[in-house]
């Protein structure tokens, strides 16, 4: 059981951002909806303080695609600024349903492909986010 009093009285370290990769998009949306609802229901005072700037938002998800080149290689992109934020990345390495094209042939993503995408997003966020989890 979480100590709700500690979570209600604790100060945020940095604004929150959630990066749910394509393999984990649905779970990321559920986590986002829960956090939005939780913060709105528990945050009824201290919202004027500058310490709570960007604490209450309608969406904490960021778009972080990993587009693939024709050779199968990919690059990690962050489509919005994450400077100074606490970035939480979510990935489902066992999601075998995602596919990509390599030299015109359809290829299913392996756990290693998902892990490589996670490393690409971490590299893209390196030195910008306050913390990466």
Regions from the PLM with identified roles:
Residues 1-133:
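PRPP-associated nucleotide enzymes
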